[in-house]
A protein has these predicted regions:
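Conserved acetyl-CoA-binding loop-helix of GNAT-fold acetyltransferases
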Residues: 127, 133-146
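Conserved N-terminal entry element of GNAT/NAT acetyltransferase domains
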Residues: 2-4, 11-14, 26-60, 218-221
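C-terminal "cap" of GNAT-fold acetyltransferases
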Residues: 181-222
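A conserved beta-strand-loop-helix scaffold within acyl/acetyltransferase catalytic domains
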Residues: 53-126
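A short, internal acetyl-CoA/4′-phosphopantetheine-binding micro-motif in the GNAT/acyltransferase core
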Residues: 122-132, 161-162
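Conserved active-site alpha-helix within GNAT-family acetyltransferase domains
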Residues: 150-154, 160-186
Length: 222
């Protein structure tokens, strides 16, 4: 299995966006620059807005909410808003100005065997306990899938021990050998390899079949 240290925790995440709507969200000035959002009706009178936000444009207040949600959802999560390195963008689900779900997404070119493929890697998908089992995570995964299609991304990949949510969304286990860069607390430790991570899941977006061969993540584990 994993030759990486305990600190190398496989995580999953997701996101996506469809219709573009402006930058303002309940007057939150912490969201500077390009933000896209989709209003989502909930059972009651309230609505959850799903936003796609570039990581660099997330302001301090919202970043603190992200960190608090991650620490609440993942026991032992470090005291920052990302596990290894910040993702490129996130999907944020906001209800009444409060962050209720989030998913990080990284644009990563990886090599599988001799084939170089363009992927979105999903990390740290999580939903506030009180909001679970209402399809929110599934919705974020559907959004990132839609974005991947519109961006010509070949695959959306993630690492998950529990595959239920993802199998339902069209992901499948992939048993390729895998290698990645071990990073712990901003220090590069070396290279990790696994014959089969047991947790890699892949969703095909385009016409290309998932290749045979070793997966070289060309970076850290998602
Ligand atoms: C996993 C999680 C994001 C699901 O969010 P959600 O909004 O409740 O998801 P959905 O409503 O779209 O789907 C719920 C289904 O996901 C599946 N599921 C539950 N926990 C899961 C988990 N940890 N991993 C994968 N699938 C899970 C179940 O089949 C569940 O169905 P149920 O509600 O009938 O039991 C949420 O439970 C969570 O934040 N867990 C803690 C963090 C975590 O484990 N994230 C996943 C990292 S890979």
């Amino acid at each position: 299995m994993f030759s990486s240290p305990e600190s190398e925790r496989p995580l999953a995440a997701v996101g996506a966006l469809s219709r573009s709507r402006g930058v303002e969200h309940r007057g939150q000035t912490c969201l500077a620059g390009r933000v896209q959002g989709v209003e989502q009706k909930r059972d009651g009178s309230d609505a959850t807005a799903i936003l796609r936000v570039a990581e660099a444009e997330i302001g301090r207040d919202l970043r603190q909410q992200v960190q608090a949600l991650l620490q609440a959802c993942f026991p032992g999560y470090p005291s920052r808003s990302y596990f290894k390195l910040p993702p490129h963008f996130r999907y944020l689900a906001m209800t009444s100005g409060v962050l209720v779900a989030q998913m990080g997404v990284e644009l990563r070119v990886i090599r599988v065997g001799s084939t170089v493929v363009r992927t979105f890697g999903v990390v740290d998908l999580c939903v506030r306990t009180s909001e679970r089992s209402h399809g929110l995570a599934g919705r974020l995964l559907a959004e990132v899938t839609e974005l991947a299609r519109s961006c010509g991304v070949d695959f959306v990949i993630l690492f998950a021990d529990d595959g239920r949510l993802y199998t339902r969304g069209g992901w499948a286990r992939a048993a390729n050998p895998c290698s990645w860069v071990k990073i712990h607390d901003h220090t590069t430790l070396g290279l990790a390899t696994a014959e089969d991570t047991g947790s890699l899941m892949v969703k095909r977006i385009g016409q290309q079949a998932w290749p045979i061969g070793e997966v070289d993540l060309l970076g850290h584990l998602f």
